[in-house]
Amino acid sequence: MTTTSGQAPVRRLRRTERREQILDAATHAFARSGYAATSLDDVAREASLTRALLYRHFDSKADLYRAVLDRACQRLVETVGEDDFDETSIPSLLRAAAADPDAFRLLFHHTAREPEFRELIDSITTASAEIARRNLAKRVPAGPWLEWASQLIPTLTIEAVIAWLDSGQPDPDQAAARVDQVVKGVIAAAQPASGSG
């Protein structure tokens, strides 16, 4: 169907579709320049919308950024889970990162640098360390090395995934096994030294 001007009519998106379009555009814009350097005009341009239309969905840039981060967290939990670590966790984390690299980088790279949103990444870091501690307690004796490994493994895993993304996602079939080798290296390093009591 065409209009009298010969152009196809513009299909109006439902509110939920429009919101997703805005969140997708905002994710790309914020990942490209960071929160502080990205304006709502940048997001509107990325989404091919007016700034006024953005304000129909979000009250402010901070509100939009929070919605982007919340959606990234929700998708991550849907893919990876939130309460356990098992043999599917690293492959799931890589799948989540590959599915939306910009959202993954925003969540774990940019957000840590944004004081206004720092509490979100801090809560993820705390929860990840607790999950690691629970799982490592089966293999590493209680004490400072358990605490060290509990903090290091989630951080190292996330940084390994970001480095994998930044390297062009090489060898996706073996990436999880490679990250797992790094995790196992930390676990081995956290074990008591031979001959120590």
Predicted regions and their residues:
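Basic, helix-initiating cap at the start of DNA-binding domains
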Residues: M1-S33, T38-S48, A62-R66
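Amphipathic alpha-helical linker/stalk segments
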Residues: R32, R66-S92, A132, A137
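Short hydrophobic/aromatic patch on the recognition helix
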Residues: A47-F58
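Alpha-helical DNA-contacting segments of helix-turn-helix folds
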Residues: F58, D63-A72, L120-I124, S128
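Short helix-capping/turn signature of helix-turn-helix
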Residues: F58, H109-E114
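Secondary-structure edge/capping motif, primarily at the C-terminal ends of alpha-helices
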Residues: V80-D83, L107-T111, W164-G168
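Helical hydrophobic small-molecule/effector-binding pocket
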Residues: F85-F108, F117-E119, S123-R133, P154
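Amphipathic alpha-helical packing segments from all-alpha helical-bundle domains
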Residues: P115-V140, P144-T155, Q174-A177, Q181-A188
